[in-house]
Structures are given as C-alpha cells and as structure tokens.
C-alpha cells in the first residue's frame, strides 16, 4: 500500500508529464510572467494586446498599508480593499472584480464591510479566499494578503494553507485569475520575513511575488528569457536575414511572444507581426497551429500580420521594401 496526499501526487510517479502550453486569459504578459517562470519553465505561449504593448502601462498596482494582524484579521487592509473596490467601480464600471484573501476570516471581514457600504455595487463583485478561486476569472483582481506584524511588531502568522503542502499551487491559481489588472494590498515587506519562515516554499514564493509586483508597478522591465527550442534549431534563418533597420521602420525579434517571428515597428510603435517559415513553424505541433491558430490569436489581440516565406525571399519579392 502507498500513502499519498492526493491522486495527482500518486499519478505523477507513474505517468508522463505534459506541460500547459498556452495562456489566453491575461491581456498583458506581466500578469502571467511570474507563474510562467516559477511553475511552467517559461513554456507558456502568451500574447499581449498590441495597444497595451504600445502603451507600456503596468497592469499592477501596489497599495502599502501599515496594518496589524489581530485575531486572524487585518482591519487596515480590509478598509484599503473596500476603498479600492470603490475606485475601480468608478473608473471601470463594467469590470468584474475579484477580491482574493489569504484566509477565511479576512474574507468575512471584507464582506461585512462591503455590505455596509451603500455605494458599492455587488453584482460584478466576488469576495473569496485563496482556497476557492479555481476556475474563476475577473477583469480586475484585488489581493488582500492580510498577514502582518502583530501589535508588538512581530510577524508570527503561520500563513494558513499557503504554508501547507501544495500551498504554492494555491498561490499559482490565485495570481492567474486576472484578465486586465491586479491590485496588491499588503502590510508586508521583504525584510519582514525571517529565515525560518522563508524555508517554507509557499511563504518564500509569496515574498518573491510581493517583490515582483513592487518592481513591475514601479516600471521595471520583465526579465524575459529566450524562448526554449523543443524540436531543433534551423541553421539558416529567414528571420535573421531580414531583421534590421530600414527606411521608416524596423524589423526586430519580439521576445515577449513566440507566436510571431518578427515585429514591425514604426517610430517606436509596434505596428504588425511578421510570420515566416522559421523556428515558430518548426516548433508548432502541426500546420494548423502555425497557419491557423497563431494568426487567430494575433487577430484576437489586435495584431495585424502578414506571412513572408523563404521562397519569396529567394525570388526577390520584397516585404515592405526589404
């Protein structure tokens, strides 16, 4: 007999693993970047809306609160969450809003406060904890960490389910629920955690996520590695032949997505995706993915696109004067 925490854990020892390949919920790469790096080995194919790429706006908002952890709740953070809901509903009245807390009692406190506010609409608002958001999605997610130093200035919270086995998976689910924006409300800073707490995988990852949101909300660029090659590298690349600066525009690699081979920029603004018969085609699972699914995803995100193949290059048929 074998003792195991779950059927998933038991099956993982006997069956081949297949990685999730794509993410279609989030409008910006930054919203999925943390999970892609920590959970999916940067394998997720994701494409941001072209207008958001050109706006260079951060999808994150960080609200620092001097809250106190008392009786399993943080009143100061709850008040900040209620005010943030009010602001979102004024600026984006049609948005769905999901408030995600890290423990049940904080969720109940926020719900009670919201019920007492007549100007807050509850039709498109859901208040949940980290354990029951699987399958949900919202236009704007408001995270309420809740955990904070106590009245004596010590961080002694046990971090609930986050610190238990599988806690990082709950965190992964929670931070990937947003389609457009995330607001993180927290009383914690990196140096609040002690070394014993950081030995726990879930707590350590929470600290890393808080730092990530802080950095991106301040305008720091994403650290995007080169897309991994799962089949083979081609020795002759049309993409490498035609990329460069031309009169009035540039053709350049777009490292933020593997759904295109090159991006065309005019006066610093992304204007079009170029699809060649290079690595993107080789990495595709089939011709339908390369010639149907990729263009459909580009169209859905507002990217104009055109195909340009090696045969056209050898026949000296120019691409926009190239």
Descriptions of predicted regions:
Residues 263-293, 311-313:
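Short beta-strand-loop-alpha-helix junction that forms the active-site gateway
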Residues 17-60:
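Coupling/hinge elements of helicase-like and P-loop NTPase modules
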Residues 43-115:
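Conserved helicase/translocase motor-coupling segment
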Residues 1-14, 18, 36, 49, ...:
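Helicase C-terminal subdomain and adjacent C-terminal extension
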